[in-house]
A protein has these predicted regions:
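Conserved strand-turn element in the central/C-terminal portion of the radical SAM core barrel
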Residues: 148-149, 161-174
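Conserved Radical SAM active-site core
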Residues: 1-133, 137-143, 153, 157-158, ...
Length: 174
């Protein structure tokens, strides 16, 4: 497994996605290594010889300028990685950008397979109108283990329950 830190010019990327104005990808690569992942096409834009799921570039970016540009906009975390994959516990890049965006008036749309997002529940609650989505491809835990390296389905459902009970819109990709 190859994990390294890389410097980037900015973390907020304008997007034409119908669900958001900005895409936020704090990492390149994803160690969930889902066999069905649409984002694996990103490998061709890297210099990594490793297969998708076996490398992770951890982004470092400068402070956000012009915070006013985000008012009444929406940011999607993340279009080609999981913002709460296991190494987020160590590097905390998703938490860093959430802290930088606090008070800007931006809405969040977050997609994950992880319950690590519970760490940031109070922070996410501070962004009105935000929503969080979890991917659940099966209820068969043995099959899930063959398909991805994410946390168990039970842990995903429990995280979803806690966000729902906290008043945050929750959705599920099945």
């Amino acid at each position: 497994m190859n994990i390294k830190e890389v410097d980037v010019k900015e973390i907020m990327t304008r997007t034409n996605l119908p669900v958001s104005d900005f895409a936020v990808n704090p990492y390149v690569g994803c160690l969930h290594a889902c066999k069905y992942c649409y984002a694996s096409f990103m490998k061709r834009f890297t210099n990594h010889p490793e297969p998708w799921g076996e490398f992770l570039d951890v982004k470092n970016w400068p402070a956000i300028k012009d915070r006013g540009q985000f008012r009444d906009k929406e940011a999607f975390f993340s279009s080609v990685t999981d913002p709460y994959q296991p190494h987020e516990a160590k590097f905390q890049r998703t938490r860093k950008i959430l802290e930088q965006l606090q008070g800007t008036g931006i809405r969040l749309s977050i997609s994950t397979k992880s319950d690590l997002i519970l760490r940031d529940l109070d922070l996410i609650k501070s962004f009105p109108g935000s929503r969080v989505s979890w991917s659940i491809n099966t209820l068969d835990e043995d099959f899930r283990k063959e398909m991805d390296h994410g946390v168990s389905i039970e842990r995903r459902l429990e995280a979803m329950r806690q966000f729902y009970e906290a008043g945050i819109e929750t959705t599920c990709f099945i």
